Curated annotation (Swiss-Prot):
Its main location: periplasm. The gene is nrfA. This is Cytochrome c-552. Pfam families: Cytochrom_C552 (PF02335). PANTHER family: CYTOCHROME C-552, CYTOCHROME C-552 RESPIRATORY NITRITE REDUCTASE.
Length: 467
């Protein structure tokens, strides 16, 4: 049956339809999300950016270090955590990870829209079209058909030009909060600020008026202590630990913050200087290499422009620093894993919230500091001394928590030491937490088979209307 439209309802329907056509008729005035649009005009940069696809190998960080499963018990990272890959894989990896779940509709799934925020130039497009409230409202799956282009040109550049920009309003606010507004920064500083839109610590706000918004916790500064004080003051927790019941903080990837504290940051050596150097192609044309990667892979164009030592010497220095960081990282993890299980035993023995509060605070602070150091993937090069300092405080605070727990458990008549489960592999650690990995993997496979093709088809149809 066809319902007859009145003149008023017909006009309204036409207006709504026209608004959708107009919205899809072109990319945003400020943001062109399609990277391919620039492959001819900026071919050298485009081709080198596309070469980030050469990092196709997937490294399972949980398999390499099963203790991580316990440290993140009750949080998405205990399900799945792989080492980062090149920019070409940003969308692929966030779609494929178990952390984003297996939504069956736009209103389904465990994660919010904010999880797209560092993955695509479609994000600034959506914010420009919908406003931040419109963009951040809803589940991650809501953006499935909208966020279709991986990290690329418009994330860092003004539309159609090489001019740098901050494309995310939350990044602009963060820079202003620490007294370094982007529009007043030098070109050298801007080359790091554009990276700091994503390679930073951030969290998703939980207040009613800004629920799910991305914010950098920099109001009091950018050190690990500054951010710890900030989070404690607003009583923020990313999740409650499944074993110890600690209100936990999950560090993201504070590369910018740790870089600022190291030799390179202190001497104003930018991210671009080391990770996107000027190179000369076969035609003798000089350009900025957009294959963001390890400086040692292009030593002469990166390290060699400042350091007089040869590559072998510099690699030895780096490996020595990394070895020290990894050794202290392992010590912190061992203390924290034990502390979580001992806290769990204390709760089972009848410990009260008042008895546990100072213990859980030590665990919270210890793991935050450990995570801050290790989640900044390049910290062994950027700021090894700061990494060792922070990890040292993590070990101390975790050890303090264990001393407190030993005393408390003794008063409860609990036999010590507390027996720990076998967590020698990722699978055993996940089983110890009662995680049904078979179901999670099956659900994800179904999502990839049924939802992803629809997202891609819808995105293709939408972009076909762009001018």
């Amino acid at each position: 049956m066809v319902k007859k439209l009145t003149g008023k309802s017909f006009a309204l329907s036409a207006l709504v339809a026209a608004s959708f056509v107009a919205a899809g008729a072109m990319a945003s005035d400020k943001t062109e999300p399609r990277n391919d649009v620039y492959k001819d005009k900026f071919s050298k940069q485009y081709n080198s950016w596309h070469a980030t696809a050469e990092s196709e190998a997937i490294t399972d960080a949980l398999e390499q270090d099963p203790a991580l499963v316990i440290l993140w018990a009750g949080y998405g990272f205990a399900k799945d955590y792989n080492a980062p890959r090149g920019h070409m894989y940003a969308l692929t990896d966030v779609r494929n990870t178990l952390r984003t779940g297996a939504p069956t509709s736009a209103e389904d799934g465990p994660m919010p829209m904010a999880c797209w925020s560092c993955k695509s130039p479609d994000v600034p497009r959506l914010i420009e079209e919908q406003g931040e409230s419109g963009y951040f409202t809803g589940k991650w799956a809501k953006g499935g058909a909208e966020v279709a282009n991986t990290i690329g040109c418009s994330d860092c550049h003004e539309k159609g030009t090489p001019k740098l920009r901050l494309s995310r309003p939350f990044a602009s606010r963060a820079m202003e909060a620490i007294g370094t507004p982007f529009d007043k920064a030098s070109k050298q500083d801007k080359e790091s600020m554009v990276c700091a839109q994503c390679h930073v610590e951030y969290y998703f706000e939980k207040t009613d008026d800004r629920k799910g918004f991305v914010k950098f916790p920099w109001d009091g500064g950018t050190t690990v202590e500054n951010m710890e004080v900030y989070y404690d003051a607003i009583q923020f927790a990313d999740w409650t630990h499944a074993v110890s019941k600690t209100p936990m903080l999950k560090a993201q990837h504070p590369g910018y913050e740790t870089w600022k504290l190291g030799t390179h940051g202190q001497n104003n050596v930018s991210c671009v200087d080391c990770h996107m150097p000027k190179v000369t192609n076969e035609q003798g044309k000089k350009f900025t290499d957009h294959k963001v990667g390890n400086p040692f892979d292009r030593f002469e164009e990166t390290c060699g422009t400042c350091h007089s030592q040869d590559k072998e010497h510099m690699l030895t220095v780096y490996k020595d620093n990394k070895s020290k960081v990894m050794e202290l990282k392992s010590k912190a993890e061992a203390q924290l894993v034990a502390a979580h299980f001992e806290a769990g035993a204390a709760w089972k023995a009848g410990a009260t919230e008042d008895e546990m509060k100072p213990i859980l605070t030590n665990i919270r602070h210890a793991q935050w500091r450990w995570d801050y150091a290790i989640a900044s993937h390049g910290v062994s090069a950027h700021a090894p001394a700061e990494a060792l300092r922070v990890l040292g405080t993590a070990v101390d605070k975790a050890a303090n928590a264990r001393v407190q727990l030993a005393q408390l458990l003794a008063t409860k008549g609990v036999k010590q030491p507390i027996e720990l489960p076998d967590i020698s592999t990722k699978a055993k650690a996940q089983a110890a937490l009662g995680m049904d990995m078979d179901k999670m993997n099956a659900d994800k496979a179904k999502f990839k088979q049924e939802m992803l093709p629809k997202w891609e088809a819808d995105a293709k149809a939408r972009e076909a209307t762009y001018k």
